[in-house]
Amino acid sequence: MELAKKEYSKLELKQEVNISISNREKKIGNVSQTINNKAAGQQTYIITEKYTPPTASHIERSKVKEVTVLYRGSTAPTLASGLTPFHKDSLDVWTDWGVNDIPTAIQITNGGGSTVTPQLKTSAETLKQTMKLYPNAQIYVYGHSLGSMNAQYAIADLDKKDIKRISGGFFYQGPNIYSNLTPKQQDTVKAINALDRLFNFIDRKDYVPIGYGIGDPTIGHLIEVESKKAGMVEQHMWGGYQFDKEGNILTNKEGSLQLAKYVTAQQLAAINIMRTSFTKSGGGLSSSEEIFLDAAEALAITQGMKQTIQGEIRALKDVFDKEIENAEELWRDTLSDARDIGSNLYESEILAALAWGGATEPEIVIDTVQDCEKSLVEATKIEQEYDKLLERINEAIKSQLKTDQELAKQIGSMYG
């Protein structure tokens, strides 16, 4: 999400792009292209590990291993841009809203359509050209709001043979454009969805993400965010998102599971690349390298399990809250009915009659609350055990790197 927010920054060519992860700065790369198609309204940043513009040699561009594509969302309309002739944002606002957002939204609310807006077309072309420019790179695509629609469409419009190069797609708070796709594009989406690399985040308290009915197909896994209420604009701009202590977005149970699977798979793939790098000279792994790689794999798997457990715990809390609410309502209704029937009795006599039949507040409410709390305590203990295990694995990795300085140089700051 932090990386997606960068699409609204005024990034310059060659600028280094960093994000904060667990209170540590991580370099994503450098801006190699800034695309500003005024006719269509498309604004996109292309980020590579180091500055490698389209004018670089084919050899240099072929060395690029990762590319991040950031599709910017709509320019927010203001009173000034709406009423002032030749205002600097007037054209952006019109092309974003009048030419792209509103026509697409109308199609979605009417069950879809085949008319493709200019910005979707140019966004698809941008992704294809980027993949040609950097032929050996894995591609990560991000987009928010209108940028989400651009990202969804660009991936759906790829040739099937190219979809394996999409290592991740992250779409936030945009309408579901699946119904606007052609049968061929929908077929491509089904194929890439099977790879579990695309994630479509929505906050249902935001009015912009339309088209996500129960059972409706989507581009990527639908990730429903557990959000808090915010102002209308803030809600759309991630203002309702909530996070755990590790900085992960709080989502529904299914979302936590899908994200944990993806992150674990990405980490294990990176470890396999590292393993290959260690043995490229033709020799086997040193004992130090073997210990490090085993610990790194254990860390990745354990982190994934912990994230899954956290999703289960949040789901349990939702179930228990509902059970407690139902129990409290049952007791209120039971007591109200008893008072109506025994209107001539004292309150103590009504309660005694209910107790004789086994209907007491402790039986109906308090026991339910205690059972739920007991189950949550047990689940939380499991989460705490994962925390302890993660701490031990991290310490083992740091100890190994401290002992083997050569290995530490190879790893860099990955686990530092």
Regions found by a protein language model. Give the residues of each.
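A structural detector for beta-sheet-dominated domains
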Residues: 4, 20-22, 32-36, 48, ...
